[in-house]
Regions:
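Polytopic transmembrane helical bundles with strong interfacial aromatic enrichment
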Residues: 1-214
Length: 214
């Protein structure tokens, strides 16, 4: 077991294997026809839901790490120790953070398209008369889209400046770095705020859609 758990990638691979074993058990014990189980839109939607949820957990988890841990603790770290965070930890976290956001939004749109509610959800359930589940999931989709935009077009570009990631801004004045850091912080806090109604909307909307048999 140690040979698996001491390596991140082997640990992830083991988790995927366990998930596939669980799926196989459901197919066998539930006497599910394999042909129907691995064909059609519903199966593809389920696969992308799985990826969507995993990506979302990483995205929101790292968002909460930034807001609940790093932002609060950075002022307490001695100046000579801060480069350990700003030069090594933060750039790596930001890589996973922004690509988890991208994976979440892309797979979410694919799921909405496969399950047939992409247009109606972005119309907030008003396309053919008001529909509560579609409104719920639509609010979540709009909030997620706004948060994704903030990550890619505000937080990430400004963090690159503030931390001089990949030495992209070696001559940027400190005043501009400070402004970039503050802007990134404010939009990270904005995403933190939006994530709370987002999670309510997504879980509520998902339960409604699950009950409708879509």
């Amino acid at each position: 077991m140690a040979i698996i758990l001491t390596n991140l990638y082997r640990t992830v691979a083991a988790g995927i294997v366990l998930a596939l074993v669980l799926l196989a058990a459901v197919i066998v014990l539930g006497e599910v026809d394999i042909g129907s189980a691995f064909g059609g839109r519903i199966t593809w939607a389920y696969l992308f839901v799985w990826i969507h949820v995993a990506s979302g957990v990483m995205w929101i988890g790292l968002l909460y790490y930034f807001n609940f841990v790093q932002m609060i603790q950075m002022p307490k770290i001695p100046a000579e120790q801060k480069p350990a965070v700003s030069k090594f930890i933060a750039p790596e976290v930001l890589w996973w953070f922004r690509w988890a956001a991208m994976s979440t939004i892309v797979t979410g749109l694919i799921v909405a398209w496969l399950r047939g509610y992409l247009h109606d959800a972005y119309m907030l359930g008003f396309a053919d008369g008001f529909d509560v589940p579609t409104f719920f999931i639509g609010v979540g989709m709009w909030l997620g889209t706004i948060m994704w935009f903030n990550v890619w077009f505000v937080i990430w570009p400004n963090q690159k400046k503030a931390l001089n990631i990949n030495n992209a801004y070696p001559d940027l004045p400190q005043a501009q770095k400070d402004r970039a850091a503050r802007l990134a912080m404010l939009f990270s806090r904005t995403n933190m705020m939006l994530s709370i109604p987002l999670l309510l909307a997504m879980t509520g909307g998902g339960l409604n859609y699950g009950n409708s048999g879509l």
